[in-house]
């Protein structure tokens, strides 16, 4: 399924599964997807934690699993799928994830970005259930790629938007996601490849490394989001710094490239040998992301980076 109006495309499940295995959520960690769509990242998070830990599923989801999205239909689907996955108490909310506590909304303000959505923020809903909330332990997400945000009451809250009257939505999501992390928290975020490679966006990368200890970058195959878009994307993994630095030290970063993305040039799943149509898509797809997970774990096992609960 695709949510193409704002460049929102539901992430292939084998990509989600790879990201969750690399981020390795623990049972005591809070996990947020601020662009949750149908809840894929949250479902795979639940399955990962349940598979690796003795877990009271409902108690875990009451406080640890959080998802927000602007699309009310996506939230309804996410709630249904999370219920099927074994959770009746997931914290799934329809709201504009780009609204911050400093957005200065008035009761009667209207605009294209948040019109019709509740005016509370992610911090509002988190503080209602998490005592002493100071940020999430993990943010894992695939934010909308396309479109620009022009609303001044939103832009003024963002460092990356203070020099212009409009900015691409995914740039704001990047800053917002890091802001929503506690210091030391981990992130896995899917981004258009140009944000990590184009000279035009170098100021975004300069801001990023001051606030985030980048650990790894995974380049996804060009067919990954077909048949919905040819947009090439990467996944950024990192740890929020305790405080922003002016100029980071030389830090080792692992660069990974997926060379088999599990789809053909028309976006159809390429199945690996020994599977049937009864198997889930992320099991059937002929991809190399299991090798990516192994390479990442090998890298982390020899690194002094504090990663995980």
Short names for language-model regions:
Residues 100, 106-109, 113-309:
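A conserved structural/catalytic subdomain of Rossmann-like adenosyl-cofactor enzymes
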Residues 5-124, 138, 146, 192-194, ...:
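Conserved S-adenosyl-L-methionine
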């Amino acid at each position: 399924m695709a949510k193409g109006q704002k460049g929102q495309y539901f992430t292939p499940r084998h990509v989600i599964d790879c990201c969750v295995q690399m981020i390795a959520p623990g049972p005591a960690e809070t996990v947020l997807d601020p662009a949750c769509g149908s809840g894929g990242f949250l479902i795979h998070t639940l399955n990962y934690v349940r598979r690796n830990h003795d877990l009271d599923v409902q108690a875990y989801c009451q406080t640890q699993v959080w998802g927000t999205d602007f699309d009310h239909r996506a939230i309804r689907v996410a709630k249904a799928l999370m219920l099927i996955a074994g959770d009746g108490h997931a914290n799934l909310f329809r709201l504009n994830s780009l609204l911050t506590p400093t957005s200065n909304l008035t009761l009667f303000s209207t605009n294209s970005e948040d019109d019709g959505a509740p005016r509370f923020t992610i911090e509002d809903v988190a503080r209602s259930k998490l005592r002493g909330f100071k940020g999430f332990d993990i943010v894992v997400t695939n934010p909308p790629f396309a479109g620009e945000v022009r609303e001044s009451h939103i832009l003024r809250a963002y460092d990356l938007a203070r020099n212009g009257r409009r900015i691409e939505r995914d740039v704001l999501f990047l800053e917002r996601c890091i802001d929503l992390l506690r210091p030391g928290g981990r992130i896995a975020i899917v981004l258009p490849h140009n944000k990590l490679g184009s000279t035009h966006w170098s100021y975004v990368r300069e801001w990023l490394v001051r606030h985030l200890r980048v650990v790894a970058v995974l380049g996804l195959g060009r067919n990954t989001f077909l048949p919905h878009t040819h947009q090439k994307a990467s996944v950024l993994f990192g740890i929020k710094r305790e405080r922003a630095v002016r100029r980071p030290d030389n830090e080792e970063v692992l660069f990974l490239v997926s060379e088999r993305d599990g789809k053909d040039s028309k976006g159809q799943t390429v199945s690996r040998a020994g599977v049937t149509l009864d198997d889930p898509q992320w099991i059937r797809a002929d991809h190399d992301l299991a090798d990516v997970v192994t390479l990442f774990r090998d890298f982390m096992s020899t690194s002094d980076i504090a990663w995980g609960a």
